[in-house]
């Protein structure tokens, strides 16, 4: 049975830093945060049962910080429509990654119309026209409710990454938060 997540991404105010500005605690976690390949495909190799849980997909405004990262001017923010898609990637019925994607409405109507609970990564990484920009990273200490939900001790750090993908004249952003049971936090000796 899949665990339901009651927290919204990104769990409060988050400061994103350009790659190289944060000290990542170990090489194993760094390999997950900075891997430019398909996260979906990598997660699928670490479990027997992989699922995408669609939390929501709706037309809404992105945050001001997301618009800045997407390179969208204030004038364009009012004119363009965006879809915000939030999913949880589960491995063997454990929530591993919470992902938030900001996708131009026009792209949803063309290429992503029937995405539903399918992984976005299957589209992005099977089309050479998608070009990934450099990562930004974040590290936070979640609130007490989050720690309690996962049975975690205080001072537990949660890591995430985000990057912009350029596709033709469009830019879309994917942010991924590695949840506590994600393989990114496991010692590499325990990886499949």
From Swiss-Prot:
Substrate binds at residues 85, 120, 176. Keywords: Cytoplasm, Lyase, Pyruvate, Ubiquinone biosynthesis. Its EC number is 4.1.3.40. Its main location: cytoplasm. It comes from the Bacteria. Pfam families: Chor_lyase. Pathway: Cofactor biosynthesis; ubiquinone biosynthesis. Removes the pyruvyl group from chorismate, with concomitant aromatization of the ring, to provide 4-hydroxybenzoate (4HB) for the ubiquinone pathway. This is Probable chorismate pyruvate-lyase. It comes from Pseudoalteromonas atlantica (strain T6c / ATCC BAA-1087).
